[in-house]
A protein has these predicted regions:
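PRPP-associated nucleotide enzymes
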Residues: 1-298
Length: 298
C-alpha cells in the first residue's frame, strides 16, 4: 500500500464460537474499485473461505469492481484429472471466486498456466522473474547457467536463461509418489557452472534437493535455487537441514514463512525478495485501465 500511496482498507474478521467466519468491511465500498489481497496458503481452507466471504461482502456493499489478488493461488497443483475419480480443484476454486462475485483475478506464477482458462473473467498473471533476475544479475556470477529441475519447468527456465544471457540445462526426474522424487539425469553440461535452478514452488523440497545433489555430483561450482512460492512444510525443512548441495535458496514473499518452522537455522542461505512493488504496480495499472503485460517486456 505504501507503493500506491494509499491506506489499507479496514476490515474485521472474527470467528464465531462454532468456528464459522464472520467478516465486516468497515470502510464504505459503494462504487469503489476494490482489491482484496489474500494468498491461499498456510491454512488454505481457512484462507480460501475468508477470501470468498470478503468478496461476497464487497459485492453486497455495492463495490463497482472487485479484484481478487492472490499472490499464491492455492490448489493449483490439482489442475487436471490424472487418475480416476479425482477432482480438478483448481477449476473448482476458480468457479467459487467467480460465484462469490470477483470481477477479476490478479495472481503470480501459477503452477500451471492453463489455470487462466478456468476463469470466464479476466486474469492478470504476473511473474516474479523481474525481481529474481535483478537480484541474480547483481551477484555477478562467473559462469551462470540456468537449470530446470524438471522437464515441466523448461519453458520458464528458458525465459530466465534469455533474460540472464546464459545457457540452459534440464534435470530429468522420475516421481515416486506425491513427495518422493528420484532425479536421474542431467541434460546439458553443468561442470564448473554457477547453477541457478528455477521453479515456481516447493513445499517438501524433494525435487529441489535431489536435483541439487545430482548437479553437485556433475561438477557444478555453486547451486542456487530461485523459487517463487515456498509454502514450506516440516518435511521441507528437514530436507533443507540435511542438504549439503545448495548454496542459496532465493524465494519471494508471496507465501509467509511459517513462524513455527526453524527457517532461520538452515545451513543453506535463505534470501526472501519482496514482490510488493510488482503487485502494487499491477494494481495501479488495473485501476487506471493500463497494460499489465507490458511489465514483462524485456
Amino acid at each position: 500500500m505504501a507503493y500506491l500511496g494509499s491506506r489499507l482498507g479496514d476490515i474485521n474478521i472474527r470467528r464465531f464460537p462454532d468456528g464459522e467466519i464472520h467478516v465486516k468491511i468497515v470502510d464504505n465500498v459503494r462504487g469503489r474499485d476494490v482489491f482484496i489481497v489474500q494468498p491461499i496458503c498456510t491454512q488454505p481452507n481457512e484462507m480460501l473461505m475468508e477470501l470468498l466471504i470478503m468478496i461476497d461482502a464487497a459485492r453486497r456493499g455495492s463495490a463497482a469492481r472487485i479484484t481478487a489478488v492472490l499472490p499464491y493461488y492455492g490448489y493449483a497443483r490439482q489442475d487436471r484429472k490424472d487418475q480416476p475419480r479425482v477432482p480438478i480443484t483448481a477449476k473448482l476454486v476458480a468457479n467459487l471466486l467467480v460465484a462469490a462475485g470477483a470481477n477479476r483475478v490478479l495472481t503470480m506464477d501459477l503452477h500451471a498456466q492453463q489455470i487462466q482458462g478456468f476463469f470466464d473473467i479476466p486474469v492478470d498473471h504476473l511473474h516474479a522473474a523481474p525481481v529474481m533476475v535483478k537480484y541474480l544479475r547483481e551477484m555477478e556470477l562467473k559462469k551462470p547457467l540456468v537449470v530446470s529441475p524438471d522437464t515441466g519447468g523448461a519453458k520458464a527456465a528458458y525465459a530466465y536463461s534469455q533474460m540472464l544471457g546464459t545457457g540452459l540445462a534440464i534435470v530429468a526426474k522420475q516421481r515416486m509418489g506425491d513427495a518422493e522424487v528420484d532425479a536421474f539425469s542431467v541434460v546439458g553440461d553443468v561442470e564448473g557452472c554457477d547453477v541457478i535452478m528455477v521453479d515456481d514452488m516447493t513445499t517438501t523440497c524433494g525435487t529441489l534437493c535431489a536435483a541439487a545433489k545430482l548437479l553437485k555430483e556433475k561438477g557444478a561450482s555453486s547451486i542456487r535455487a530461485a523459487v517463487t512460492h515456498i509454502p514450506l512444510t516440516e518435511k521441507g525443512v528437514e530436507r533443507l537441514q540435511a542438504d549439503t548441495s545448495l548454496t542459496e535458496l532465493v524465494v519471494t514473499d508471496t507465501v509467509p514463512l511459517r513462524a513455527d518452522l526453524p527457517t532461520n537455522k538452515l545451513p543453506v542461505k535463505l534470501t526472501v525478495l519482496s514482490v510488493a512493488e510488482l503487485l502494487g504496480e499491477a494494481i495501479r495499472r488495473i485501476h487506471q485501465d493500463q497494460s499489465v503485460s507490458s511489465l514483462f517486456r524485456y
